[in-house]
Amino acid sequence: MYDLANSAFSTTVITAIFPVYFTSVAGADLPPGEATRLLARTTTIALATSAILAPFLGALADYAPIKKRLLGLFMAIGCIAAGCLALVVRGDWFLAAVCFGIGNVGFTASLTFYDSLLPHVAREDEIDRVSTGGYALGYLGGGILLALNVAWILSPATFGLRDAGQASRLSFASVAVWWFLFSIPLFRRVHEPTTRAGRGARSAAELIATSLAGLLHTIRELRRYRHALMLLVAFVIYADGIGTIQRLATSYGAELGINQAALITAILLVQFAGIPFAFLFGILAGRIGAKASIFIGLAVYVALTIGAYYMKTERDFYVLALMVATVQGGTQALSRSLFASMIPKARSSEFFGLFSIFEKFGAIFGPAAFEMASRTTGSSRSAILSVVVFFVAGALMLSFVNVRAGQDAAQS
């Protein structure tokens, strides 16, 4: 149920409504293009903070019996930050940026502890089903609340609201309430798992030092699985491009003059259309292989990013949104499953922990590159082309991955 709960923040705040609101309302008095750059900068800082915290939080999650308490703490931080966004009005760009950044850290950090609970609530033969089921619930939950939020914004008078601005602020408050309420079942029904505390580590500092030593050991071990390591590097690069598109699409569209209703409706289209296409990508991978399918996904991303440079109308934005829906879920899901096939099963948790940390660190560079390119060129339209570099470089690294050799190494 926590996937259902936290997805509201991902869809309404990170992806759909807040970026548009920030550009058109909170940052309306800023110089042209500055709101989009500020949003990219805030995203970079939040992701960097999360990446720095990740190994330390992972240490506590592995060794101390406080997973649920820390999950609750960061969930509460995220909920409060989302609720505070409802206070943001025209010109409050600083308050908006601070709340958005803190909310991002709370959201990401809570997932560290949530993910660590999975092996404790599902048997080994159930983990894939439980994990994908949670992912589907997340799509559903985020889509349902976003649909309601879109209805408020498109027709505020129908719901007794003054205008779209008030409807947007109510949407942020609804995220806080939704996130909190649907988190309750986890805290009521999931027991705090036993930990390795006491096995040679006695203080918080020693626990963290022990975990970081284990992280360095895992990195050294991964070098033995050369093709899995190359896949990890490739994924970190192109996933950064995917994340940048996801996080900055609506603010970019708003800056180019696409109205708020069209932007949010397009994101809603991605949310629901992405579900069947993710399954179709799985079928495609069964026929031509995961690696080839990922290449197709990256080619589509290159095409839609170039298309974003030429985008002028709402119809263009809808077409690009549909292109995202065709590849977003499938590309990321196949990347994870391909990585899983190239690491020893007995050490999957260890290697996926490293996967998660690398992913968080990698996510910093896309928004940072976009902001730098925007400042250099003076145009977000030109800056969007910088994202193509991540897809091309990631695909180039992926081309060196020998899937069969990697799978053989994992089984030896």
Briefly describe each language-model feature range.
Residues 52-66, 276-290, 374:
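Helix-to-loop junctions at the C-terminal end of transmembrane segments
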Residues 178-189, 385-412:
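Multi-pass alpha-helical transporter architecture, strongest
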Residues 191-232:
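Juxtamembrane intracellular "pre-TM" segments in multi-pass secondary transporters
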Residues 86-99, 309-321:
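Helix-loop junctions at membrane interfaces in 12-TM secondary transporters
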Residues 31-35, 151-177, 372-391:
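A membrane-interface helix-boundary motif in multi-pass transporters
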Residues 109-122, 330-344:
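Intracellular juxtamembrane helix-capping segments at the cytosolic ends
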Residues 1-47, 227-266:
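Helix-loop boundary and gating motifs at the non-cytosolic
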Residues 69-84, 292-307:
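Structural signature of the two symmetry-related core transmembrane helices
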